[in-house]
């Protein structure tokens, strides 16, 4: 049984008030709240096991190393990677994509080679490739979408050429909630001999992800969007790909030997993890994944699907409501505008009612240009949200609308 009240008790922040109103937190697409189990894991490790990992023979260092590497194994199991060598710890999805963009472009691309992305990408899956375009002369090609927010797969197929070296797209749009057909799109790319990077920041918290079933070559996600801490993320890569890519940064831990004449690099995954890792953060990430696993990813997905369907129904009843993104397969994100009310005004006034939503372009300006708007209000749901909170949101939107 999915006991929502018991779940909410694990998140003390949900009991607080904002401007004298109960907090209604609907900004989970930006970051999720943290259960007490995750916060306690952080404090417990600082209080009792704090020591640098991989670098000491003393007991604390060995214990911290065991926790850190056990966390890597937890991530491996959670996304069903073949080996923990395929799990690279990063600061988040953004760094994961930048790591791959740099290493892949350096070793696998030359001027005129192409990367395919989609029109609905977050800036973190556009700008890193533009930096490589400026540095190496690679070409960015863009998958278009229809007005429902669904990628046009026929057009996607036409983008491939003999110069296409990589496809990189969001599993789930952070603006539209569209769940892209990743497995099908990966198969298409592989038919052309092209590897694929999936931005999984918005999918991992909301659905079961199996990187082997997807056959993804690379997959990136962030801890803080799946009830873990900020500052820690993951880049999964097939071992055969990670083996052939050069390091992204240099420093301690990623080396095997160093002289002034030559440096040789460490084995996987450590050659991509220069410097002291966020070993406290990785332990907390593992605790967050354990928390999600205990609730059941499928149970969470069912709960959030019901919430999203209910929210779509309630919001469509509001006069002047425009919802952006009505794909047949949609995750728990709803972006909207009401009448001529500016998204910043709507978000600010909802905040005064205790309702936390996101406003603006959501780091997806090319998508906003495609839709002919400058920004939206975005409500995004998590495992602890309720239908009663959706009712408060709908009532709040109606109240704000009457002010204009």
Description of each model-found segment:
Residues 1-404:
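Pyridoxal 5′-phosphate
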